[in-house]
Amino acid sequence: MLIKLLTKVFGSRNDRTLRRMRKAVSLINAMEPEMEKLSDDELKAKTNEFRARIEKGESVESLIPEAFAVVREASKRVFGMRHFDVQLLGGMVLNDRCIAEMRTGEGKTLTATLPAYLNALSGKGVHVVTVNDYLAQRDAENNRPLFEFLGMSVGINLPGMPAPAKREAYAADITYGTNNEYGFDYLRDNMAFSPEERVQRKLHYALVDEVDSILIDEARTPLIISGPAEDSSEMYKKVNKIIPHLIRQEKEDSDTFQGEGHFSVDEKARQVNLTERGLVLIEELLVQEGIMDEGESLYSPGNIMLMHHVTAALRAHALFTRDVDYIVKDGEVIIVDEHTGRTMQGRRWSDGLHQAVEAKEGVEIQNENQTLASITFQNYFRLYEKLAGMTGTADTEAFEFSSIYKLDTVVVPTNRPMIRKDLPDLVYMTEAEKIQAIIEDIKERTANGQPVLVGTISIEKSEVVSRELTKAGIKHNVLNAKFHANEAGIVAQAGYPAAVTIATNMAGRGTDIMLGGSWQAEVAALEAPTEEQIAQIKADWQARHDAVLAAGGLHIIGTERHESRRIDNQLRGRSGRQGDPGSSRFYLSMEDALMRIFASDRVSGMMRKLGMKPGEAIEHPWVTKAIANAQRKVESRNFDIRKQLLEYDDVANDQRRAIYSQRNELLDVSDVSDTINSIREDVFKATIDAYIPPQSLEEMWDIPGLQERLKNDFDLELPIAEWLDKEPELHEETLRERILAQSIELYQRKEEVVGAEMMRHFEKGVMLQTLDSLWKEHLAAMDYLRQGIHLRGYAQKDPKQEYKRESFAMFAAMLESLKYEVISTLSKVQVRMPEEVEAMEMQRREEAERLALMQQLSHQDDDAAVAADLAAQTGERKIGRNDPCPCGSGKKYKQCHGRLS
C-alpha cells in the first residue's frame, strides 16, 4: 500500500527516467529549425566536427542533443521520415545501457539509427545484432543511405563470408550481423594462428534487436565450434533397432498406470529413465544383437559408451518429435528453434543426440563432434564495453536483464494510444473441440472481411490447423520453418481483407503487418512502374485499408499458450500497431502441453465441477489466473536454470578469458624465446625433482629412471651415472645445472642449423598448437565434471563450490602440462639439413602419387584388400616379396603393396 502511495507521489522509476530524458527531447526539438537551415554539405560536415570534439576530450553523452538532431534531419532528407519524440526517447534509453521496450510498429529500426550513429563517432565500431541473416541484410541496406549521407561506413557480417570481407565489415563504423555470427567470429579469432587471420576489433558497443530472444531464449544454447571425433555411426544404427521394443511407462498418478513400462519420461525436466524391467529387457536385446557379452551389465565401467548410446537413442525416440523439434530435409536432420519456429541450419545437438535422431529417421549419420571452442551468449555479450537492446516485450523479464546483464528495462510510451481488445482465454476439454472452435471463429471473422493471424507453437500444430481450414474450404497461407524463404512476403500481405495466415511462434518478427496489405510490395513486384500505376496501387490499398479498419483490424488467434507470457505477448503485439484497431484471443485445451504438465489438475477439476458438455468452453477469470500462474512457474524455473548455467559457465569463462588473453599476447609477439627459456627451467626442475627429491640423500635418487625419462621425453641421452662415479663430489645443485646446460646446448645446436628466425617461428607454432590441443581436452574434461558434479550434493557438499575447486585444480594442471608438452616437443624435434628436407619432400610426393594410383585401382576402403586383388588380377603364381609390384610403381612388392597385406 505504502509503495503504491509513494509511486503515485514520485512516479515509478520508469516515469522518472523518461521525465529526465524528455528535457533532452525538448532541446533536440528546439534545434530542429536551425538544422533545417543547413545545406546537405553542412549537415554532413557535422560528423567530422563531432569526431574532432570527441578527440579533444568531449564525452559522447554531451553530444546527444546535437547528434540526434542531425540524424533526425538527415532522415527527413534521405527517407522522408522524421523521428517521433518517443523514438528520440528510445534512442536515449539505448545509449544509456538499457533495454528499451517499444511496441510493435513503433519503428525500432529507425530508433536504432540514433544511438548507432552517436556511438560510432568514437571510431571504435558499433555492432547491431539481429536474430537472422534476412533482418541483418534488410536493416543494413535500408539504413545504409542515411549513414553514408552522414559519412559513416556500413558493413554486413554474414555466415560463409571470406575473412577479408569479414575484416572489412568489422572495420566499418556500423556493422550489422546475427548473434551467432558475432559469437562464432569471436571464437574463430581465438583459434587463429596469425594476427592477420583475426577479423574482429575490440568489442565496443552492441545494440541488440529482439534482445529478449537473444539474451534470454537462447541463453541456454552455447555456441560451439567443433571438430570431428571418432566414427561410431554403426553403433547408433544397432541401438536404434532395439528402442522400438521398449514400452513407455504411464505416470504413476494416471488412471492407466500398471508399472509395467520399460522407461519413464519426465516432460518437465526433458529426461528419460529406464525402469528395472526396461534395464533387464534392454540388456537381453543387446546380448541378442551381439553388442554386449552375456552376463555383463549395462552399468559396468566397460559399457559406459554403450550406455551413452542407449540414453541418446531413448531421448531421440521419446522426447524429440519430427516437425516439432526438427524437420528432415534433403536427407538431413535440421533443428527447429523452439522459440522462433525457424530452422537452425548447421546447428547440431551434442552428446550424440543428433546422431541418434539421424539413426531414428534413417538418414546418413554424421560423425560425433569434439568441442574445440565454446561460449554462451550470456558471456559473449558481457564482453562488450557497452550493451543495450530493444524489443516489444521485455518488461516480464526485467528482473533477469537486471540481475544477469546489469541492464535496466525502460518501457517507452507508444506514439499513439493502444486500442487493441485482448479477449479472455477460452478453454476446451479436448484438442479437437478447440480446433473446431478456432475454425468457426475464423469463418465468422473472414466473412466480415477481417484478416486473421493464427499463431501455433510448432510446425506440426500449424499443419493440423491448415488441414482443417482446407477441409472447411478457407484459403490461407502457412508460414513455418518449411516455408522459410517467402516469410517476409507472406507476413507483409497478412493484413489483406479476409486473409488467413498461420505462423509458428514469432516467425516473421521484424516485418510489420500493414492493414490492407503492403502497397510497397506490390510496387516492388512491377518492372519499372509508372506514376499512374503507383497512384492506382496506393488508391486500391487505401480502400482495402479502410475496409479492414471497419472490420475491426487484424485479429490474432493463439492456438496454445506458450511456456513464456512474453512470447504470447509478442504474438498479440502483431496486432494494434501505431493506434490501429485489433483484437486477440487464445484458445486452449486440457491436452495442451502447458496445461497437461503444469496446470491440469486444478483447471480440469474446475471444469468437471462446472459440468462441461462436449464442445463447450470455459471462460472465467479464475482459469486465466490459473494459467498465468502456471506460466509464472515455468518462467521462474527457466530463469533458475539459466542463472545456474551462468554460475557454472562463469567458472569456465574466467579460464577462457585467461587462455584467450594469453593466446592473443602470444600471437602478437614475434619472439617467444624468453618464455621458452623460462618454462624450460621450470620443466627440468620439476622433472629432476621427481627422481632426485630436493635436499635428499644420494641413496634416495633414482638415476636410471631419470636417464630414461630424459631420453624418452626430451631426447637427451646423458651419462649421469658415469658422472657420479667419476666425480663423487658432484652434488645435487651442480647436477641440476649441468643437465639444464646440456639441454640448452643441444637446443642451440639445432638453432644454428635452421637459423634463429625459423626457430622463433617454430617455437610460436608449437606453443599455439599445444595450447589449443590441451584447451580442447580441458573443455571435454570440464564438461564431464559439470555433468556429474550435482551428485556431490548427496555427500552434503555444495556442487558449485566443488566445481570451482576442481576446475581450478584441472586448469592449473593443464598449464603445467602445457609447459611440459612444449619443451618436450621442442626438444624431440629432429632438425634436417636443406638437402635432407628436399629428399623427404620428394619421398612424400612419391607416397602421395602412389596412394592416388591405389585409389584409381580400387574403390575399396581396405588397402590390404587392394594388395590381394592385385595379386589375383595378375592370374599368376603368388607374387614374391622381391618381385616388382604389379601396381606399376617400380618398387619391390615388399616395399609397396606387400607391406599392406
Swiss-Prot record:
Catalytic reaction(s) noted: ATP + H2O + cellular proteinSide 1 = ADP + phosphate + cellular proteinSide 2
Primary localisation category: membrane
Binding site for Zn(2+): 885, 887, 896-897
Conditions for induction: Repressed under conditions of excess protein secretion capacity and derepressed when protein secretion becomes limiting. This is regulated by SecM.
A single Gene Ontology CC term: plasma membrane
Cofactor: Zn(2+)
UniProt keyword terms in alphabetical order: ATP-binding, Cell inner membrane, Cell membrane, Cytoplasm, Membrane, Metal-binding, Nucleotide-binding, Protein transport, Translocase, Translocation, Transport, Zinc
Pfam families, alphabetized: P-loop_SecA, SEC-C, SecA_DEAD, SecA_PP_bind, SecA_SW
Details of cofactor binding: May bind 1 zinc ion per subunit.
GO molecular function: ATP binding; metal ion binding; protein-exporting ATPase activity
Gene3D superfamilies referenced in this protein's UniProt entry, alphabetically: Helical scaffold and wing domains of SecA, P-loop containing nucleotide triphosphate hydrolases, SecA, preprotein cross-linking domain
Binding site for ATP: 87, 105-109, 512
Localisation per UniProt entry: Cell inner membrane; Cytoplasm
UniProt EC number: 7.4.2.8
Keyword NADP: no
Coiled coil: none
Listed NCBIfam families: PRK12904.1, secA
Assembly description: Monomer and homodimer. Part of the essential Sec protein translocation apparatus which comprises SecA, SecYEG and auxiliary proteins SecDF-YajC and YidC.
Function per UniProt: Part of the Sec protein translocase complex. Interacts with the SecYEG preprotein conducting channel. Has a central role in coupling the hydrolysis of ATP to the transfer of proteins into and across the cell membrane, serving both as a receptor for the preprotein-SecB complex and as an ATP-driven molecular motor driving the stepwise translocation of polypeptide chains across the membrane.
Family per similarity comment: Belongs to the SecA family.
Name the record gives this protein: Protein translocase subunit SecA
Taxonomic source organism: Salmonella arizonae (strain ATCC BAA-731 / CDC346-86 / RSK2980)
Classification lineage: Bacteria, Pseudomonadati, Pseudomonadota, Gammaproteobacteria, Enterobacterales
Gene transcribed to yield this protein: secA
